[in-house]
């Protein structure tokens, strides 16, 4: 007669495992999910989780809802174990030792933060900070907009725009240029750092959408554009977060291009290039350098990451071609030389 408390000695074997590459680069992290159930065959699925995790700051309330639990305590700076860089940046913390993926804080950045979160600018970016990781700053802006103080996590008033976006699940990033005739879709002519100015925050348009499944009635709103809401819904913080994420991607690519050790680790994973570029395309309109990298891959796909990084360091290896950008349905169609090159698709941002 079997006892009810008898331990189960035979368990189903776990055939899946998860690995992460480029963990020291917050926006470039790549996750590998492998299934070893097949005989003599390992199925690997690559995903650019670093850029996907960064995009979740664009839906702050859904991103930080786990911090709203009673009794939540912010992790201490002096933890027993070193906090991973990606965890530190996504929670608004910073590592005790300064790393290279930082940018200097100038007056233009402080003015941009003051325009985005005027009531909390001094707490989001303290006056004594002279260097900051862009993704850490984006996380702190998102926490404030979600209704949580970025220093001690006490409740504050959330941003009205964040409340309106809480149930959306994806966002399309569009950069527009305003001239005398109106606004038109165009690539940011400079680097992503150029977006971090108070007068440039409104040039990034965010179109939010919902996942509509087959069993759901299609009589609800299909999209939500914060720029079309009344003036009581501020949108400057959205443009600031978009610019900070794109700046982080550029910084991390610069650092990875100079890190031979990490390049040797990522070089054998040639299958990771396509998922990485596919996610990078969602940020292409925010920077001319990112757009040029995506267009180059569309013309002649990169064989591996070292080749991708060579073209990042030396864009002149592939001459730039004029491209046209048109809004087609839920994506932006980028075409050149009379053919479609790729599509800028919406980013998943979670949801409530």
From Swiss-Prot:
Family under the similarity heading: Belongs to the aquareoviridae NS2 protein family.
Biological function: Protein that binds to ssRNA and may be involved in genome packaging.
Entry keyword annotation includes RNA-binding: yes
Keywords: RNA-binding
Transmembrane segments: none
Source organism phylogeny: Viruses, Riboviria, Orthornavirae, Duplornaviricota, Resentoviricetes
Domain of life: Viruses
MF terms in GO: RNA-directed RNA polymerase activity; single-stranded RNA binding
Subunit note: Homomultimer.
InterPro entries registered for this protein in UniProt: Reovirus_polyG_pol (IPR002507)
Organism encoding this protein: Aquareovirus C (isolate Golden shiner/USA/GSRV/1977) (AQRV-C)
Protein name: Non-structural protein 2
